[in-house]
Amino acid sequence: IPAVIVGSNGHVAWGFTNSYGDWLDFYRVDWANKDRSRYRVAGGQQALRVASEWIRVKGGAPVELKVRETRWGPITAELDDKTSLALRWTAQLPGALNFGLSDLAVAGNLDEGLAAADLAGIPAQNLVIGDSGGRIGWRLTAQLPDRAGTCEPTSPLAVADNCRWRGWLPPTENPSLADPADGILWTANNRTLDGDALRLVGDAGYANGARARQIRDALRAKPKFTEKDLLAIQLDDRALFLTRWHQALQDEAARSGSVELKALADAARTWDGRASADSASYRIVRAWRLAVIERIQNGLLAPAQAALGQRFVMPDLPQMEAVAWPLLQQRPAHLLPRRFESWEQLLADAATDIHGQLSAAGPLSDRTWGERNTASICHPLAGALPRVARGWLCMPADPLPGDGNMPRVQSPGFGASQRMVVSPGREADGIIHMPGGQSGHPFSPFWGAGHAAWVQGEPTPFLPGDAQYRLRLAPET
């Protein structure tokens, strides 16, 4: 989109996080004939529409892509000889995308900014916006589907469910909050809604709330903040979420006969409580937790895996902590995965697995988080080059602090796309970070500019410096 996605115009400043709402439905398509040219609908049958999309290949023949369309959307998967799945997704519907986001650049206050956001055709996002008068607001932006009938989100919809999309909800139905009583707003890919609003938006995999909680608590800690104070919140790599898991590892090792469990606990005994690049304890505790949760999840989903066989796909369950931690505290026998004789054996088995992985590379005390969390940030075309030349299109392989469940969210290939701190009207005091820099041209003198500051967390100015080049677009006539 040729617009300023996030930024400040002197009157309002705004930014986004992903909404993780449920913006699609799968429909079961029951074929009415063997050649799959007709499918069943309420009250009869309907003909399948087939459209050809041609992909032009340089130096080769065009490739035809046939798109099979139903009344609900395109066929995207096959269940068996008689049934397929069709996808109905907001992004594929008329009116879903437009250039309305560009109007935020000329908004003069909070109300104008929220009004502009209501007309923006973008993927659904959490918008946080503030104006120079001190007002702040949050709104779930984008077009929201108006569902009717029985639209159960946990399984593919059948014709009998009569789930239909009647178009778009009016913008007044979008969840919104302006001028909160406590004067703060926060969002970090977490669930922001409850009750009827949550039922309207749905759940497509909200992030664990640990990161959002640290941000909220930091914002509540002081009445006023400078730009550097707010940058410090974004750079917070405290591992508060894992503190109880560190204690669980120590407690379990103290009463266990597992040599590997004791070795992990000994190597992680000094707990600095941060996802710092030089921390071995953080890496050990994190890995053990994930191994424990993996065993619990596999056990709970074993019946589904047995029933589906090769069709089973392990779901991504970012809220699994809310299941796993109570199980570890209560240790109910009827929910213990069958391959283990006790919960203690499960915990020891997870330790054996992690001990084997980490010790294979050397002493546990040397297996730092930075060794695992090393930047792998490359130009999209890097994968097309021979390995020996790939480095020309990649940023340095820096050991990175931070992780997913804390404000300084960053991993080898994922993280906050930028950090921004700005008060509208005071852009000269603002701060900006962008991993990889703003230039996508590897031969540009600005290739990678600012990347080192992002790695180190050093403040860099929000406003650009003096212009050094000018690109002029002039029509021929």
Go through each PLM region and give its residues.
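C-terminal/peripheral segments of proteins
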Residues: 1-257, 266, 270-477
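N-terminal small/hydrophobic-rich alpha-helical segments that act as secretion/targeting modules
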Residues: 261-262
